[in-house]
Design a protein with these regions (language model features):
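Active-site-adjacent segment of SDR/Rossmann-fold oxidoreductases
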Residues: 68, 89-99
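Substrate-binding pocket helix/loop in short-chain dehydrogenase/reductase
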Residues: 19-20, 27-32
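Residue(s) in the substrate-gating loop at a strand-loop-helix junction
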Residues: 63
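Active-site loop immediately N-terminal to the catalytic Tyr-X3-Lys motif
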Residues: 21, 68-74
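A short helix-coil junction within the Rossmann-fold of NAD(P)-dependent oxidoreductases
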Residues: 2, 18, 45-54
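Active-site helix of classical SDR
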Residues: 43, 79
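C-terminal helical subdomain
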Residues: 99, 103-104, 123-168
């Protein structure tokens, strides 16, 4: 009832890194709720309108961690891999409506993400890593604009990028 929806930037995430043996069940639930269900709810909110208008673009934000898991990051990596899988399934489903789907998997980008860990030692380590490695949010924005600025018959399905100096 609000008119056209041309683009959804589906970008929300929590990154509570911790070894599985710590059994941070509350963090796991929150991470799954935000990183997976949040993406699904965003899609559900715009998909009917995009189908009616026979076009649009959904940009889901994953992470380098959705491609590679590190010790302490299994749950986060699993949720970000799920975003990639959801995005590919969505891409296959929405082709008849000319809806484009892109999944963007950034490495360390300046944001409040390192603050999302409830484990003090992990939070401080992530803050230090981001302080040394993170690239400006403008670099992320340029990746989004690249995907969005392609001709209507071109669908950039996946972009994986990270700071040059980032190890993984």
């Amino acid at each position: 009832a609000f008119g056209r929806v041309d683009v959804l930037i589906n970008n929300a995430g929590l990154m509570p890194q911790a070894p599985l043996e710590r059994r941070t069940l509350t963090d796991w639930d929150r991470t799954i709720d935000v990183n997976i269900k949040g993406v699904l709810y965003g899609i559900a909110a715009v998909l009917p309108q995009m189908q009616r208008q026979r076009g649009g673009q959904i940009v889901n934000v994953s992470s380098v961690a959705g491609h590679k898991v590190r010790a302490g990051g299994a749950v986060y990596s699993a949720t970000k891999h799920a975003v990639r899988v959801i995005s590919e399934g969505l891409r296959q489903e929405v082709k008849p409506w000319n809806i484009r789907t892109t999944v963007i998997s950034p490495g360390a980008v300046e944001s409040e993400l390192p603050d999302s860990s409830t484990e003090a030692d992990v939070r401080e380590a992530m803050r230090a890593f981001y302080a040394e490695n993170a690239i400006p949010a403008d670099d992320f924005a340029r990746a989004v604009v690249y995907a969005m600025s392609q001709p209507e018959d071109v669908d950039v399905n996946e972009i994986l990028f990270r700071p040059t100096r980032q190890e993984y």
